């Protein structure tokens, strides 16, 4: 978010082409006609019948989660961020599209069988206009038109493949998650995972294609973003292929395939960056003293985390809840210095850690020796009621939750100057995950344990715990303001108070995965401070 990095893409999901702008009205009409002709030939989304769906035990549908990602990306359309180059409109428009498609998942795909049969017995057929408006790929057409008007992609037909791919990925990935990993997600959680994958892969592909078609000199932050985009695409193809070709899940095939994907990824990234990736990474680590400091600090925190986990497993004295909150504190200590000193470097490290955890989960689920058993034993101390399905995602949710503001930010992430005072709408949104989960959730748990007396209706959470979580967030922000690291107006304090209170209430009452929900909920209002 440093203005000097003006040519960097907006986070790992950013990137835009330098195609010539503007097109005639006749070309627009021709493009729309071609798009309307193509739409009826597109496949319908595979149905997910609610009565047959094996969702996470004890969780409500959580359909309201489908609006969180679009709301978090909506600031990309604000005039406040018009100075960013390229404009973050593409990410925001695609996010709105996956939000509408996410609602379609519930409205059309997740109806109970009885409701479907009742509609058939009525023999009522939708009028052509209604069939068009409710077609699962209609949002793709609308988004392609908006992209042609608001971004530097001048023609809806050029944008349509991108928007169609985004919708297809959302439907396909969501369907795959529910059918392949039963009992691991609520409806809302599965939808938000599908939205995230669709948005990340689509924006990453666009960034790579733009780099190939319209090469230009890259800024440092742009290089990091392009490297992350390449990693996202390679990782997605690798995981998709593993689950499409059963032979690749055999131990003697898995490791060679993993090596091949690594070589391909390094080669592709080297071509896109114009520099051999290992050398580029070495230069990246030595870019500034702050990065060396962060590496040392993160190494010490990793040793502490591994040591306390090993001790807890041997002694069996530390309750699971306490051990999990210790990791909340550790990740807070990881992210706060990173955001304040080197947000772009933190972005790269957080993305790499998340991908590593996802890869380890694939190894564990597929029981690939000799690592699967070791991984399962390492994850055992962190399991809770939300990990009763096939997947164990609590640690990934925690890491992804605190990292999500870095991935969604509409402006480039650059190097912070030590001692520089950030505007509140620049640094606080990047700390949304830390404030909501690392600070608020942890303080709520500790406060509820020792001070809690009045329980929220229908839950084990206490009002006192929620108040502790809210106050803790405000105190941390106050410390940042007092240290001169953040400027916050009086009106900003009021909005922060309301946002922290809302997050505290949701944390107490929701049965969805709060490590993902809370950061997204806090991020959006913090962008308006």
Which residue stretches match the model-derived regions?
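Hydrophobic alpha-helical transmembrane segments
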Residues: 1-529
């Amino acid at each position: 978010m440093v203005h000097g990095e003006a040519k960097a893409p907006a986070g790992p999901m950013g990137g835009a082409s330098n195609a010539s702008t503007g097109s005639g009205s006749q070309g627009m009409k021709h493009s729309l006609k071609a798009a309307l002709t193509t739409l009826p030939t597109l496949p319908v989304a595979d149905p997910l019948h609610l009565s047959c769906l094996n969702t996470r035990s004890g969780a409500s549908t959580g359909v309201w989660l489908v609006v969180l990602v679009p709301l978090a990306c909506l600031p990309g359309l604000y005039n406040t961020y018009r100075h960013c180059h390229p404009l973050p409109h593409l990410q925001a428009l695609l996010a709105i599209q996956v939000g509408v498609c996410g609602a379609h998942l519930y409205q059309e795909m997740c109806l109970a069988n009885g409701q479907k049969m009742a509609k058939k017995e009525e023999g009522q057929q939708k009028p052509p206009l209604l069939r068009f408006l409710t077609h699962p790929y209609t949002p793709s057409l609308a988004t392609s038109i908006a992209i042609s008007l608001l971004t530097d992609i001048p023609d809806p037909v050029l944008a349509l493949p991108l928007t169609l791919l985004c919708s297809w990925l959302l439907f396909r990935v969501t369907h795959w998650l529910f059918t392949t990993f039963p009992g691991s997600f609520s409806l809302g959680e599965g939808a938000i995972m599908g939205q995230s994958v669709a948005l990340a892969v689509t924006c990453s592909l666009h960034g790579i294609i733009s780099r190939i078609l319209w090469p230009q000199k890259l800024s440092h932050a742009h290089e990091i973003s392009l490297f992350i985009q390449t990693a996202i695409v390679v990782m997605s193809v690798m995981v998709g292929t593993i689950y499409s070709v059963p032979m690749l899940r055999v131990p003697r095939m898995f490791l060679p395939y993993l090596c091949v994907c690594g070589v391909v990824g390094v080669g592709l990234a080297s071509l896109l960056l114009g520099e051999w990736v290992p050398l580029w990474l070495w230069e990246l680590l030595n870019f500034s003293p702050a990065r060396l400091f962060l590496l040392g600090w993160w190494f010490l925190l990793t040793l502490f985390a591994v040591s306390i986990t090993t001790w807890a497993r041997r002694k069996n004295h530390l309750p699971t809840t306490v051990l999990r909150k210790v990791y909340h504190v550790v990740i807070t200590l990881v992210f706060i210095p990173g955001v304040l000193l080197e947000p772009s470097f933190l972005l790269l490290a957080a993305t790499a850690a998340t991908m590593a955890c996802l890869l380890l989960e694939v190894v564990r689920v597929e029981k690939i020796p000799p690592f699967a058993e070791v991984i399962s034993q390492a994850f055992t101390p962190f399991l809770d009621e939300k990990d009763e399905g096939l997947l164990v995602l609590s640690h990934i949710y925690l890491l992804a939750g605190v990292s999500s503001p870095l991935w969604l930010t509409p402006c480039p992430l650059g190097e912070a100057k030590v001692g520089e005072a950030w505007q509140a709408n620049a640094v606080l949104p990047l700390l949304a995950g830390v404030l909501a989960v690392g600070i608020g959730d942890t303080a709520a748990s500790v406060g509820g344990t020792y001070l809690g007396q009045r329980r929220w209706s229908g839950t084990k959470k206490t009002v006192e715990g929620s108040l502790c979580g809210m106050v803790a967030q405000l105190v941390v922000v106050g410390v940042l303001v007092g240290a001169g690291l953040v400027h916050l107006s009086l009106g900003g304090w009021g909005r922060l108070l309301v946002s922290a209170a809302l997050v505290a209430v949701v944390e107490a009452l929701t049965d969805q995965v709060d490590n993902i929900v809370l950061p997204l909920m806090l991020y959006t209002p913090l962008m308006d401070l």
